[in-house]
Every structure is written in structure tokens, then in C-alpha cells.
Amino acid sequence: MVSLADFGPEVRAEVKQVREVVAALHQQLIKWNLVVWTAGNVSQRLHSADLMVIKPSGLRYEYLTPSSMVVCDLDGNVVDGAEAPSSDTASHAYIYRNMPDVYGVVHTHSTYATAWAATGQNIPCGLTMMGDEFGGPVPVGPFRLIGSEAIGKGVVETLKKYPK
């Protein structure tokens, strides 16, 4: 089993910095009412190694700290952390393996986005500023169950249909 100690000082320094960023981003999810209870998560891929940092499973947002963030390889195996990683770890890892230009994943459960996603329809481009920002409708991925690569596969399949 690989551990964080197997990596050099550059990687360990980046892990420390990314843990701080990912923990802080989770607090922003609460601040902006984008999640409830323990649902949703943020992860970030490292630039210096094929590793990612993600929140632990089941830990309430108010208890998240940089040291509670879990470091995993891009197959979802834990490299460092005291807790089990998020139940969405396999999906985040799938996205990073299949979209190498992606360095961050944010999975929220905001009320309006969740309600819209239940319709299975793309969000129409109804404003000029949406067209400027997104280039057209905002794609909505297919429904998938958590706990496997399924959500990640749905995200990759959906996003690969659209130009960058």
C-alpha cells in the first residue's frame, strides 16, 4: 500500500496546500446553501502527482479541517487520511482519469439545481450572459447511483459532447 511518506517533499507540500483549499471550499458550500447535512463534496487533483484530495465520508461540514481531508490515488485508494473517503471518490477518480485537463470537481445539492436535474433536461440558455459564459444550454448529466464510478461516467459522457 502506498502512503504519503512514499512521495517527495514537493508532493507533500502540495498535498498540505490542497487540503487547506479543499477544506475551505467545503465551508463555502455551506455558506452559499449549496449542500445539506453531509451531501456533496469537493475534490482537487494534484499537479505534482496522480493524487487527489477529497472530503471524508459522513463527516458533517462544520467538523471538516485540512487534516481531515483524505488523499487518494486516481483509482480511489487511500494514500493518507484517518477517515474513509467520500462515497463519491470512485466517480471523482473516474473523471480525473478520463479528463486529464480537469483538476477540480464540485458536487453540490443546491435546491434549484437538484430540482432541475430531476427533470433530466439541460438548463436552457435564456440570457445573453449565460450564452457568453456557457456558449449555450448548461448540460445535465444522467441520474446515477452513488458509490461507484457511475456518476463520474455520466459526467464524462455528458461533458465530452460539448466543446471546451
Which role does the model predict for each range below?
Residues 1-164:
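Glycine-rich flexible loops
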